[in-house]
């Protein structure tokens, strides 16, 4: 099980959650978001995150099929996607739980 901390302000591409585990994500990125690969079970802490993927089909937070994801919000978090897309996209047979203060 992976335990990783990611500063999105240092990422030059979309961050891919491809393994089960716990991820803590911080920072601002005006070009890239987060993608969770199919079948992943993870807890993702968003700590004062500001993510924008403003391409016409851009998605700030994409969760593929058959995932079980818990997102825990800490601080102020902003997710913004392109004009045609929701900020968080959840595919078939995935479960998303969102918790926060």
What is each stretch, according to the model?
Residues 1-101:
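A composition-driven surface/loop motif
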């Amino acid at each position: 099980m992976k335990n990783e901390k990611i500063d999105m302000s240092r990422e030059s591409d979309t961050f891919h959650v491809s393994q089960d585990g716990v991820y803590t994500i911080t920072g601002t990125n005006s070009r890239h978001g987060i993608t969770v690969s199919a079948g992943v079970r993870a807890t993702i802490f968003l700590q004062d995150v500001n993510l924008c993927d403003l391409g016409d089909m851009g998605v700030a937070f994409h969760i593929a099929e058959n995932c079980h994801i818990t997102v825990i919000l800490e601080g102020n978090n902003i997710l913004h996607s392109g004009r045609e897309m929701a900020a968080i996209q959840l595919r078939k047979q995935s479960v998303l739980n969102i918790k926060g203060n």
